[in-house]
From Swiss-Prot:
Keyword Phosphoprotein found: yes
Residues annotated as the enzyme's active site: H117
Cofactor: Mg(2+)
Protein name, per record: Nucleoside diphosphate kinase
Function, in words: Major role in the synthesis of nucleoside triphosphates other than ATP. The ATP gamma phosphate is transferred to the NDP beta phosphate via a ping-pong mechanism, using a phosphorylated active-site intermediate.
Lineage, broadest ranks: Bacteria, Pseudomonadati, Pseudomonadota, Alphaproteobacteria, Hyphomicrobiales
Keywords: ATP-binding, Cytoplasm, Kinase, Magnesium, Metal-binding, Nucleotide metabolism, Nucleotide-binding, Phosphoprotein, Transferase
Quaternary structure (record): Homotetramer.
Subcellular location(s) of the protein: Cytoplasm
Annotated binding of ATP, by residue: K11, F59, R87, T93, R104, N114
Record-level Gene Ontology MF annotations: ATP binding; metal ion binding; nucleoside diphosphate kinase activity
PANTHER family given in the database record: NUCLEOSIDE DIPHOSPHATE KINASE (PTHR11349)
């Protein structure tokens, strides 16, 4: 098993409902350690840059509006196979398809307001981590 770092974000729908602690606890209970965390209010420009990979998708403008509608909590997680473990704990993008006990099954409101985002690969994790954090902010 490999010790990895991954990026996690608690989205505005969850921060509005004061779920930051509950979601972080679910991540920690799964064996992931938070080694960097901050609460940010993403600007539309930051949302456009962060989600640029989806620029041509029909939901892009709605995604940008949603992600800039309230605070998010951005985190760096560390643990054995952290990328896969985080994705497992998050559950399927559509909460109705998510496994029982996953973050999205428990907390998501809809496929759009699905409470969390997590990196899908090591390359994406590195890009997303460096988008929000400088090396000095990550304390393992």
């Amino acid at each position: 098993m490999a010790l990895e770092r991954t990026f996690s974000m608690i989205k505005p729908d969850a921060t509005r409902r004061n779920l930051t602690g509950a979601i972080t606890k679910m991540l920690e209970d799964a064996g992931l350690r938070v080694i960097a965390s901050k609460r940010v209010w993403m600007s539309k420009r930051e949302a456009e840059k962060f989600y640029a990979v989806h620029k041509e998708r029909p939901f892009f403008s709605e995604l940008v509006e949603f992600m800039s509608s309230g605070p998010t909590v951005v985190q760096v997680l560390e643990g054995e196979n952290a990328i896969a473990k985080n994705r497992e704990v998050m559950g399927a993008t559509n909460p109705s398809d998510a496994e029982e006990g996953t973050i999205r099954k428990v907390h998501a409101l809809s496929i759009g307001e699905n409470s969390v985002h997590g990196s899908d690969s090591a390359e994406t994790a590195k890009t997303e981590i460096t988008f929000w954090f400088s090396e000095i902010e990550i304390v393992g």
